Structure formats: C-alpha cells, structure tokens
Amino acid sequence: MSFRNLTIAAIAGAIVSTTALVAPASAQEEGIYVPLLTYRTGAFAGSGIPIADGMHDYLTMLNERDGGIGGVKLIIEECETGYDTKRGVECYESVRAKNPVVVNPYSTGITLQLIPRAAVDKIPVLSMAYGLSASADGETFPWVFNPPVTYWDGASVFVKHIAEREGGFENLAGKTVGLLHLDAPYGREPIPVLEALAEEHGFELKLYPVAAQDMQNQGSVWLNIRRDRPDYIYLQGWGAMNPTAVREAIRTGFPIENMIGVWWAGGDEDARAGGADAAGYKALSFNGAGTDFPFIQDVITHVHDKGLSQFPRERVGDMLYNRGLYNSMLIAEAIRTAQEITGKSVVTGEDVRRGLENLNVTEERLAEMGMTGFAAPLNVTCENHSGNHDVFVAEWDGEKWTVGQDWTEPMTDRVRPLILAAAQEYASANAGWPERTEPCDN
C-alpha cells in the first residue's frame, strides 16, 4: 500500500512514493478527511492516473482558492490499490480509523466488498457511475451512492442511440449487438439490462468477455467478432483493454463508428491509440472535455500554476482527468450540503451520507461553480441514489472528443424496475440485510 498526504504541497512531477505519509493528528482533528483509493500502477494505470489526478486537483483547488469547504480544510490522502480488490480492502482498513467522511473505491470489485461494511462503519460509499447498479435503490442501500448514472442507465442509452441510428426501436429486430467486456464484475454489470432490452426489441446479444490477463492480447476475441459480424459493439472495458480494442477494431475492419464505449472506455488515450483511423469512435459521457470552463481555469491557476499537480499541464482537459474533477465536485457538494443540513463545519461520515442523499446540483449551482455546459443537473433522493443523470454520446474526431449526440435521458421506465428487483434480490441473498432505519431529509 502507498499513501500520499496531499494537504502538504506536492512536488511537481514527483514519483508517487511507496512510503506512507500520514497527516498529523492535529490536522486530522481540524480538517475534513477525504481518502482517495486510486491506482497509478499496473495494467489499469492508463485510466487510473488521470482520474486520480483530477480528483486530487479539484479538492486541492478548493483548499487553495477557498480555504476548503465552509472554512474547513480538506485532508486528502491517497492509497494505491492497483485496481486489486484485496489491496483495495486493505486500503479501506487503513483509512477507516481516521474517520473518513466518504470512501471512493474506484473499482466495482472493491465496491462490492465495501457495500456490507458501509452501514456498520457509518462511512458512505460513493461509487460514481460504477459499482453495483442495484445500489441506486436508496431504500435498500442507504449508505451507498452511484450518481450521476448507473451502468444499467448507460446500457439503455446505448440501445436508445443505436435505435435512433436505425430509424426506430422497431428496426432493431434481427440486428446483432455485441458486448465486449472485461471479464470482471465491472464488465458484466450491463448484461441484465442488455438481455432485457434484447428480448423486448428482438435483437441478438452476443457476449465477448476479455480476461484481465488478455486485455492487450484480444486476437482470439476479435476472431469471434469477425465470425459473428455484429452490427454494433458496446465496449465495457477499462485500462489497457480499451486502446487495444480500438486498435483491433481498426485492424479487423470493424466499422469504428459502430463501436460505442461506456464512459470508462472514453479516455483520450483510448481513442488516440487508433490514430487517424479512430475518428468516429464513440463513447458515452456525462462530463465535458477540454478546458473552456471557468472552474478548470481555477484548477490551472490555483493548482497547476503553483506546482501542486502531478498531471501534465498540456493534458488538462482530457476526458478522464475532467471526470476526476467531476467526481470530487460531487464529494465537495455532499460535504457542503451536509454542513448546511447539520449546521456543523467539521462533518462526519453520517453527516455526509445525508449530504449525498440531498444532492441537488441545479443549473444555477452549476453556473455558480463555473460548470455551465460541463455537466447536466443532478438530483439525488432518499429513494434514488443515482439520479438518472442524462448522458451524451461523445465522438472522437481524430484529435479530440466532440459531442456526437446531445444529452439523452436513460430509459428509466425500463431500468428502474430492474434496479428495484435486483436490490431486493441482493437483500434476500444476504441473510440479515438490515431494513432502512435512517431518516429521510427530502
């Protein structure tokens, strides 16, 4: 395990140390402790690094520009998981005693291990657009949050997108849709929704799992894809799997415009791997790319210009870096909301759980934060812990991400009943799963 105390100004460009740097007890007492479970090493580092830096840099910007949140500094500390579930749980055990106000596992596998712990330890789990889709049911999972959107919502937007391209849902009958996915809990998440929509609309669903050890060697999988000739591919990949899939699609002649990635398959390095031939590749997204937003200019001024970031200045605005910024905005808004609800300056995990459950990021609030056009409004409630945020389809133009299809609402009428049923199934399968006793503030 490796830790970084990020309340101390980081040396620009420094290599992340494997030595634990723990905030002094006095700082722990005076600040709000926000641990970040990250991965800067291993096969998933290409995706993990920009997100880790984005999360760190937004929180650091709040410390530098505003003195923290509500006058209280944020104590930011990283723990390296390597995207490994066992190491992730070890990280959680290491930070748990320091009274974190929220935990971001940044791995579906780690999230699944922490879900049963959250209510016991009184530490909310924020699995931003990842984790267990069923945890969007706040009645069953009062301590787990997955805003702004679930994997099941994303799969429904993908189907909605291809239906629009085909001229209507009725024209999906007889089509073949492939799910190219990491053979892990994360990669398998969209299968139930895709199966349900395939049955409803008459398309055939083909599954193409990729083992973690084969992420950079997908030749056999793409032989199967060439044999089956699916009309569309939904890419639920991560780390080194994504750029490899883009290159393989181009190499085998699969129409790149017909491969659409989930939001975690929409990194700049993912698309850039295909060179000019990757133009037309698409991925779902819920945050903007680029630097043309006032809050990102604040990150540049208060973090990068002061040498407090490890992320290359020229890559600020990359899609996944911006997603890390967005993730930390949710953390910060939950803390701010918790302060408003409780009247406290230094809040606890129990307080921030209430803050997450009352997140209401309006257009006006987005404008106040300098995020107009960067994200859609978000409203989390006691019943709905994801918010069913709109999603847009981003398209790679050969150099950068553009908006290929405007903000699209998930098929909530189809997805929500499946989420509620899956939540009840989870509770039934876990003997003694507690009934919700937490009061509702909305």
Predicted features by range, described:
Residues 249-327, 408, 422:
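Extracellular/periplasmic periplasmic-binding protein-like sensory domains
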Residues 87, 133-134, 142-253, 290-297:
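Extracellular/periplasmic Venus flytrap/periplasmic-binding protein
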Residues 95-108, 126-128, 176-181, 229-239, ...:
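Periplasmic-binding protein-like
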Residues 15-25:
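C-terminal segment of classical bacterial N-terminal signal peptides
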Residues 81, 125-127, 132-136, 213, ...:
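Venus flytrap/periplasmic-binding-protein-like
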Residues 308-321, 332-406, 410:
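Segments of small-molecule ligand-sensing domains
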Residues 29-33, 46-53, 65-138, 147, ...:
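Beta-alpha junction/loop-to-helix N-cap segments that form part of ligand/metal-binding clefts
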Residues 31-56, 79-86, 107, 180-189, ...:
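Extracytoplasmic "Venus flytrap"
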